[in-house]
Amino acid sequence: MRNSLIIALVFLLSMTCHAQKISMLDLVGKTWVADSGYDGCGNIDWNIVFSAKSSEHKFVGKSDNKVNVFTYNTYLCSYSPEKYEASLLGNTYGKYIVFERKYTYKGKEYEDFFCGEILSLESNRLTIRMKHSTILFIAK
């Protein structure tokens, strides 16, 4: 019985450690530069600057220096949502980061979202697991 209680206590403590919540304030005020793990990292530089409710994503072609800048509505969430939830815009705590994309490409308007799990955040390192990759960002 005593061993069962100890195992249960260890399990609960480990769950608490894994339930790390990130604050949007930890992301704001820095330029996060994608270092590795994303599609096109050999061809494109990717930087993100966060504000309380949005994020600016800057993509620069390494061969032609072509710049594309997109601003996405952004919020943090405690769970991985199935769709973008506008009512959560402004939510500043959570383990998942959600981006709403609205953009025009070749004259046609598009809208979708993507979500990533924040695996770790240190003062100058951010690791996000996206659908098909794990991306490391370095703060500059």
Label each PLM-derived region with a short phrase:
Residues 29-59:
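Start-of-domain marker
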Residues 1-4, 20:
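Positively charged n-region of N-terminal signal peptides that target proteins for export
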Residues 15-22, 137:
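Bacterial Sec-dependent signal peptides at the C-terminal "C-region" and cleavage site
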Residues 116-139:
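Short, exposed beta-strand-loop hairpins at the edges of beta-sheets
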Residues 37-41, 58-123:
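Contiguous, well-ordered beta-strand patches that form the walls/edges
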Residues 45-52, 70-73, 137:
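Broad, structure-driven detector of short, well-ordered beta-strand segments within folded domains
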Residues 4-15:
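Sec-dependent N-terminal signal peptides
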Residues 19-33:
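N-terminal helix-cap/turn-to-beta initiation motif at the start of protein domains
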